[in-house]
Every structure is written in C-alpha cells, then in structure tokens.
C-alpha cells in the first residue's frame, strides 16, 4: 500500500523541498536548531497574534522584535527605532504592557522572544522629545537612575572615517549617533539594567545591534552582569558584527559573550544563486572564512542588507525563495527568516497612522511581505525541525544550477536555479513510500495537498 508520510522530498522547478512537522515544545530558544523569524517593524499586538496563529503551529522556535525602547521622533523612517532616547519600553510599535502581553502570548504558543537591543549609542539628534515624552538634548538623556550626561559618551565626537582603524570604529560616531562610553562601569550598569528589564518581561535573548562598534570586552562585561542574575543566567545573545576582509574587527572576537551573525554566508549565497552555481554550495559549511556552525546566526537577508543590496531580498523573487529553502535545508548555523514590508525608498518606514504609530500588519493586503508564511519558509521550518540531528547525505549536483541532497533517512531536497526543468531519478536514504513535496503543498490529515513523489525499496 502506498503511504503519505511526514518526511521530506523535493522536486524540480525553481525551489523544492518537503515536509511539514508538528511544532516541538518550546525549548530554551536558540540554539536548538529550530529556526527563528525577524518580524521587522511589526507591532507588538501583531506579533502576539502571529505567534498564536502562524509561528507556533509552523514550528518557529523564536521571533525577533524590533528595538522596544523609546526612540527619537524624526519622521516616519524605520531607523528612528535605532535612535534611543531612553530605555523606557514605549515606542511607535507599542507600549510596555503590549510588549509584555506579546511575550506571554508567544511563549504560550511555544515561541520565544528575542529583542533587538541598541546599546552602542543614543540618538543622532541634537535635542527634542522622545516618543514617550522624554526630553533630551545633545549628550543629555534623562533616566530613572540618572540617565546619561556628557561624561557618559566617548571623547571622539566625529564620525567614523576609516573602518581600518579599530579605535575610530569603536569610539567615534556611527553616522552621527552619540557613542556611549561602554568602558564606564556606570554605562555598563545602565545597559545591563535595561536588558534585565526586558528579561523581566520574559524576553529570552538579544540581538546586539552594532556590536562591532562596542569593544568585545565591554559587551562581555555588560552581558556578564546580566548573566550573573538568576533571571538572566541563560539569556541567549547573537551579535551583529559585519565582518569584512582586511578589517581589524571580526565576528570571532565576540564569541566570548554570544553567537554572531554570519554576513559572509548571506553574501556568498547571493552570489552562487544569482550565478546559477548551486553546485559550489556543497562544502559551504566547511569554509574557513565562516564561523563554526554552532556559533553562526545565518540569514538570507536582514533589514539593512535588503536595502543596500548586499544580499538577496524579497525583490529578487524566485532566487530569494530558493535561497531560503537552501538555508533551511542545509545543515549550517542557526537560521532566521526575515519578514518585513515592501519599500521603494531606503528610509521608508512601515505603514503608520496619522500620529505616527505603526499600523498592525495585515498579510495578504497592504505592504507587509509576510515572507515567513510562504511555503518556501513556513513549510521548510517544519522540514528543518523534522530532520534535526541528521547530517547531509546523498549529495548530487550537475556541476552548476542543479543540486539535491538528503538529511539522513528523514528528508530530501532538490533545487534548480536554472532556466530549464531538471528531471531525473535521485538516490535517497528515504524508506520506501509516498512523500509530500512541502513547497508545492503540505502533508495534512494523512494526505498531501501538493505533489506526491514515490520512493521505491532501493531509495530511488
């Protein structure tokens, strides 16, 4: 008798792979080989709903939120979220109460929450009133424990001119943003208190924004303070360190206090997909210029790279979808899917009300891409969870645009970046049976809503 199983197999065409697995119980957040998602500029109420309705059922392990702290009011640009005015949890994305409710809802759905933490700097504005009503001026930011004054900022008051100069990168200003003196015990404690406040709301970990601009020793001290507390002991951290050849500051420096995002992975993936050279990806995980797999946060794009063209983005159509399938199928790193909104202007923020609040995301209408709901992402999250713990097996390629590989006896994926169909019989390690292609559909109720592929007793 033929059977439809929740394993995995792929097909031809531009992107194919398989199986939808049930969500596993919530673990301690990454790293646990459950993929995450960044819901960029989504409101807290929208994220809460998405955790319950989509992320939990799909098997996502965690969600990264945009920075939750009070920010400068400049206009509708997305980057105002990255210009802190105070560490109050109040922003154009929602209130403290809404953030706490979101964390509770997500954890109830088996999804942990990671906050994007801006700790390198305050705003780049000369003065004004923050989103929550906090007045500020150049190098003067009030706070509940005294806030920051001129003595709490680095002596270099000019912008970074050379990324070959470590001192400039870590002590001067990043595009005019007022650079905090993170070597100061006072500043370190202020930042640690902010992070612990988020932990008290149930936040599981942090993406440290602009970590490259903070000396690694300073971050180790700050995060050491957080982890010295009972509530912060197991907090997860992934650093944003944009590595570039020939520069003195590299991601590996920051592994003492957390994992690091692997930008080289995303750049390389773009190049190989767009040049139809998927075959060269076979040994990607062993390349010496990449971080060890268990320390690398990987992505196809993030909010910066989708705007500067450094990586693929939703604007690249099929190439982008194919790259996400590969990332979620290939055994390297801790993957995160990026899901933001469509834009034509680099600075354009998410849709907002007349008073500046970001509007709740609406998938299927409006400008939010909802890329995390696509079959190539949501169903592949299930695939990755189903094959967790298996290694790469049965690699095949045609020397160029076509590749296929297995994940032990649990899954198999075939990808074709070429312009013509790839048709062949593949050797797999799968038990005999009928398998559901989860890019064209999904396994549901013992049946397959997409293409079914049969594997014989020899695994072909």
What is each residue range found by the language model?
Residues 30-36, 40, 44, 50-56, ...:
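Active-site-proximal helices and loops of the catalytic beta/alpha 8
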Residues 130-175:
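Core domains of carbohydrate- and sulfate-ester-processing enzymes
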Residues 182-194:
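Alpha-helical scaffold elements lining the catalytic groove of polysaccharide deacetylases
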